[in-house]
Amino acid sequence: MKKYLLILMGVLNVYSFVCFAQSKYYEHSNDWLKKSEACKPAFVYKKHSPLRIVKSVKDEKAYQGWRMEDVGNVDVLFNESLKKHSGIILDFGEHLTGTFNFSLKILGEHIASDAPIRLKFTFAEVPGELNTPFDPYPGGLSRAWLQDEIITLMTVPIEASIPRRLSFRYLKIDVLGASSFDFAFDKMSFTAQSAVEKIEMDLATTTDPLIRKINEVGLYTLKECMQTVYEDGPKRDRRLWIADLYLEALANAYSYKNHDLTKRCLYLLAALSNDEGLLHATVFEEPHPHPQYGQYCLDYALIYNVALLEYLKVTGDKETAEDLWPVVVRQI
């Protein structure tokens, strides 16, 4: 009985939190939150494996003074003792956002896994990140944003994963603690996720090569930021800002055309406006939809109006525009 009471209390706490987060100014805020949830995208998943082993090379001409150089095949990870390869760097070939999974195996027969193994995984977007010490950390933002994870594995063989979502291209693996037995990776994969699939845009044959490259990078960056909302960034500050909604929705309208994601963000921001009907500049999805309280900016509130107008222009969805019209008027 006690167990069921605790579950009921938890459900009520969640319900009260969500209700408290919603605006009391608009009578339809609860409906707006439901409409936002109905537009939540289904992810496109794709599994990736490391392509090559690389090493960091100092290069004054390279971005941030570092570049990567190919040094070997990833097969050694699965056939040789990982203890021989502590500090190895893997290149997955492209920037990815998602989850990392792996499994370990013992090398040899009749060998006991007699002690735990401790591994450190450092995920980096660019070579310079792997070559800049994380500690001591002088930054004002949370140190926990940096993507270094230490995992202790009590037995081998074992399957494991990094518990948080990651954004990276390069992965460095250090062996921090091990016993006398040899072990290697049995499997390793990264499951990338996005609300959209990769596309190729048809540009004019006369398009400058630099513009083509900028367009390619822009498309990829947008894809990585299109998760369950238009994120400010898939690695850090994973939340929805009004200005990011405006900019990313504009780019999406001419590329991926996932207008439901734009609609979701418009409704989510409206549902979580403050009790005076004014929009918060930024909102969060987890653990439940809620705003960054006190984060009000007139410029951002007005940008919301422009974002809704652009959405109407590209979709012709008058129903949504009329539904959110009271929010537009209130910001002015």
Model-derived regions: residue spans:
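Short, solvent-exposed loop/turn elements at beta->coil junctions and helix N-caps
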Residues: K235
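Bacterial Sec-dependent N-terminal signal peptides
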Residues: M1-S23
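Sequence-pattern detector for short linear motifs
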Residues: L5-L6, K55, R239
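Aromatic-rich carbohydrate-recognition surfaces in CAZymes
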Residues: A144-F181, L210, I214, L222-C225, ...
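Extracellular/oxidizing-compartment recognition motifs
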Residues: Q22-D232, D260, A281-E285, E319
